[in-house]
Amino acid sequence: MQVTVETLEGLERRLNITVPAANIEDAVTAELRNIAKNRRFDGFRKGKVPLKMVAKMYGKAVRQDVLGEVMQRHFIEAIVKEKINPAGAPTFAPVENNEGADLVFTATFEVYPEVELKGLDSITVEKPTTEVNDSDVEEMIETLRKQQATWAEVEEAAEAGKRVSIDFVGSIDGEEFEGGKAENFPLEMGAGRMIPGFEDGIEGKTKGMEFEIDVNFPEDYHAENLKGKAAKFAIKVNKVEARELPELNDEFVSKFGVAEGGVEALKAEVRKNMERELKQAVKNRIKEQAIDGLVEQNEIDVPAALIDQEIQVLRQQAAQRFGGNPEAAAQLPRELFEEQAKRRVVVGLLLGEVIKSEELKADDEKVKALIEEMATAYEDPSEVIAYYEQNEQMMNNMRNVALEEQAIDAIIAKAQVSEKEVSFNELLNQQQPAA
């Protein structure tokens, strides 16, 4: 086998491979002999059919199959020989191989970029420092009360925090439009669910009032036929309601699975959950800054094949969130996912290089600690831990999480780290989706 390597644009490479004719003919003959030996032919005992007859019947198809297998096998031998690391499947050039002639073909593919990490000591990380205090717990308790609130009709004007039940009919240039009409529509004032100006027009109105308001649909409104249009709404207020919060008592506490200890036990449970959430938020914020810095300091070429693979993953995840239809996933435009897919690939390649350069391996104690920490969110942590320990795939997933965290720790160790005191709410509101 003869091999030459061409460097094309960017990460693209082309192998020119020549396979001696004898290798091809030997493989074709071996396959024809196998057919003659194992298939039945009319008029011949099994295994006694002439090879020339088999070649006449199956020779062309066998040759094509052999060429495909030979190209794949010799491509693998070539990349091993040349120490090349492909980032995706090769494209074999169309080839014709005449009997008795050498097989000459090309394989075009992308390779992984050569990554040389730099600038790790220039990465800046601001570590948030905070704690869950009593006022944070009280605020969370109030949030829980609001979630359990009921609504009661009041003889008061509509304002932020109250809920109204309204009938409305919308029109544009005197014509009603689809989706612009409703009866007994519940609207929580101040929630910002409606287009700009709609809630403002209702504020101050009381039960039984009928009136009209003029509004404009935003230019980026989801319905194409309504974008930027001026509309008039005829509205009737059927009732105004105020939120009634439940009493903070044992009955309220029992709704959250706290059987004993009353309000103080609920507060303790809420604090524990908030502290767990806080710990994860701090970890996420540090990780986010470390990865952002790593990407900013290390610009690399990205194989298109890897981006394509990641787009497929993101498409499938999107389809699962909306019913799991694979056909629908295929129809989603790649532009929706391209930027995120490229970011994921870049981060994966750079973290992979950190792991390689630091010679990191998943630490068993860290894996165990991660599983135990995750299990505390469940009613029976021991059952969750046992499930992981008995499931090798789940354990491998957790080992990957541990390895990524160890890579982040390695980046942090070389970065410029400072501390900043923030509140619980401020930290949680800063969170962004992980890369």
UniProtKB/Swiss-Prot annotation:
Family, as annotated: Belongs to the FKBP-type PPIase family. Tig subfamily.
GO molecular function, one term: protein folding chaperone
Gene3D superfamilies registered for this protein in UniProt: 3.10.50.40, Trigger factor ribosome-binding domain (3.30.70.1050), Trigger factor, C-terminal domain (1.10.3120.10)
GO cellular component terms, semicolon-separated: cytoplasm
Chief location of this protein within or outside the cell: cytoplasm
Gene of this entry: tig
Protein name: Trigger factor
NCBIfam families in the cross-refs: tig
GO biological process: 'de novo' cotranslational protein folding; cell division; chaperone-mediated protein folding; protein transport; protein unfolding
Enzyme Commission number(s): 5.2.1.8
Residues in PPIase FKBP-type domain copies: 161-246
Keyword annotations from UniProtKB, A to Z: Cell cycle, Cell division, Chaperone, Cytoplasm, Isomerase, Rotamase
Described purpose of this protein according to its UniProt entry: Involved in protein export. Acts as a chaperone by maintaining the newly synthesized protein in an open conformation. Functions as a peptidyl-prolyl cis-trans isomerase.
Enzymatic reactions: [protein]-peptidylproline (omega=180) = [protein]-peptidylproline (omega=0)
